[in-house]
Amino acid sequence: MKQLYGVIGNPIGHSLSPVMHNDAFEHLNMDAHYHAFLVKEEVLGEAVRGLKALGISGFNVTTPHKVAIMDYLDEIDPLAKQIGAVNTVVHKDGKLIGYNTDGIGFVKALQSISSEPLQEKRILLLGAGGASRAIYFSLADVGVKEIDVANRTVDKAKELITACTATVHSVALSLEEATEEQENYDIIIQTTTIGMHPRVEHTPLQISSLKKGTIVSDIIYNPFETKILCEAKEQGAMIQNGIDMFVYQGALAFEMWTGRTPNIERMKQLVIRKLGG
């Protein structure tokens, strides 16, 4: 019997997840299908109950449901509970279990380009929203000890830092302070929507002086190279856009659902092609 998977969100027509997962199913000769479901906020509960009743094997959760979905699940993974958001649901033994693969997907993407362990790195996070929180908690979860957070509203950065129970040395900074301190970091991670199409001329941080070997990562992938990545490249930094994070979080969900490991590079190249790269 064909296994059913999917993604719920609103809007959902732009999602690249169906293309990525269905190609992986085909490549691995699996009898499964992944479908995008448009689910409005006011019917989220009914939709989740319906998916469970239909016997869906698992599904992803995207905007605007990542927080609200938690009220409709039977169990929530401890890391997802700490992050306060779920993006992956596994249907197992009659229960819907929520996980967050966004943060750990980002960590795996970062590990794929870093020649040294992340635990030894001093990291700067730009932004203190949902994506930043997932990344901060996941970096802490793998043992990173120094993570500073810079945000337009410093109090929001402080809130993120104090919410984490792991032993991490962190300082909350203004964006101006982060600009002055940028050469003290091994890795800079941009987690806001600043610089996303169509406002591509914007950047949260003017890159002017980086130490040698710095990695600058931006979770945005439209455009492929945001202003902050262009400036970092000019400074000689290794850069990474948001495609890797998207692919790795999807691959982690795929493994949780199926127990099979998809071809990461195949997934990545497919997404790049679909984005017109």
From Swiss-Prot:
Catalytic activity: shikimate + NADP(+) = 3-dehydroshikimate + NADPH + H(+)
Record GO terms (molecular function): NADP binding; shikimate 3-dehydrogenase (NADP+) activity
Pfam families: SDH_C, Shikimate_DH, Shikimate_dh_N
EC number: 1.1.1.25
UniProt-listed GO biological process terms: amino acid biosynthetic process; aromatic amino acid family biosynthetic process; chorismate biosynthetic process; shikimate metabolic process
Protein name: Shikimate dehydrogenase (NADP(+))
Keyword Metal-binding among record annotations: no
Subunit structure of this chain's protein: Homodimer.
Positions with a binding annotation for NADP(+): G127, A128, G129, G130, A131, N151, R152, T153, V154, D155, K156, I219, G242
Keyword Oxidoreductase among UniProt keywords: yes
Enzyme class per UniProt: oxidoreductase
Active-site residues, Swiss-Prot/TrEMBL: K66
Function recorded in the entry: Involved in the biosynthesis of the chorismate, which leads to the biosynthesis of aromatic amino acids. Catalyzes the reversible NADPH linked reduction of 3-dehydroshikimate (DHSA) to yield shikimate (SA).
Naturally occurring in which organism (per UniProt): Bacillus cereus (strain AH187)
InterPro entries: Aminoacid_DH-like_N_sf, NAD(P)-bd_dom_sf, SDH_C, Shikimate_DH, Shikimate_DH-bd_N, Shikimate_DH_fam, Shikm_DH/Glu-tRNA_Rdtase
Pathway: Metabolic intermediate biosynthesis; chorismate biosynthesis; chorismate from D-erythrose 4-phosphate and phosphoenolpyruvate: step 4/7
Signal peptide positions on this chain: none
Family, as annotated: Belongs to the shikimate dehydrogenase family.
Residues that hold shikimate according to the record: S15, L16, S17, T62, N87, D102, Y221
Key words of the record: Amino-acid biosynthesis, Aromatic amino acid biosynthesis, NADP, Oxidoreductase
GO cellular component: cytosol
